[in-house]
């Protein structure tokens, strides 16, 4: 019986780690399929890759956490449950201290296009980041960025005084520290629970991207949205690959993935911002009021950005990051570079943006060696 159980467990482990079929690989995302970070970067991406590889690389997309829950996506791609996955870095601060260090610098530049491209370049090229991915058994494929986070509330929040004491759903990390800095009460709950919190009154505000007005139906339970840009989220990766899967591809197949990730990096940003515009328009039509932050609230955010850098460095040091101040300096330089590169580019032109991602990032990678050596 002991031999049978051991053999059964071994076979089960092999079955879980193997692709769904000989020519089909698992792609995991915990957002719903209708979300812009899944529609393009996973559903459309899978179709485009299959077409360009003549079906030799075919992904089966699992969305809405149907394959892996959010906190398990890093481990799941490492262990081969998924061959590619999205991962939100704040779920694994101990495993990904560098990814969280730069991810918590979300207030330095709140332009989501800039941050999507900058986080991608950093993750693909920065030596300390590459070492961190390797230590976790993941090949980094590309980054992302949400649109700006706003306060969506069931009570008017316009001034610094209005913010004080408000219970705000925050994404953790720097966002929670900002809430405390301005006298609010940070509440850590999944985005799937924002609606209930606002509806029952356990939350006063949800701080999230404004497409949540539609995607999480928040427009039914909020009365106002403050346009103070409270950072944007880009910690972790949009595509992280299982090492064995990646190294089993040909260089030509890896080049296809590079090309298509460049395209979807651009496409998801264009689509995300379009979804935000649609959601805000729909919510205002339904009666939501859009409020501008007062000068005191804007100044409080500016003061926080300066003050919080010390906390970022302290947290990173406690997690074993060497020279975190230099990492931040280097990342700021990458951000500033992308701010300049994107200055005159049409933010709605997916092809132009994708070409820029290729020429400045992906075409500079060696498909023979990246993630292999």
What do the predicted segments below correspond to?
Residues 1, 22-23:
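Absolute protein N-terminus
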Residues 1-8:
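Bacterial N-terminal signal peptides that target proteins for export
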Residues 9-10, 20:
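Cleavable N-terminal signal peptides
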Residues 16-22:
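Sec/Tat signal peptide C-region and signal peptidase I cleavage site
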Residues 23-113, 140-373:
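N-terminal secretory/targeting leader peptides
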Residues 109-135:
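Short, solvent-exposed loop/beta-turn-alpha elements that line the ligand-binding surface or hinge
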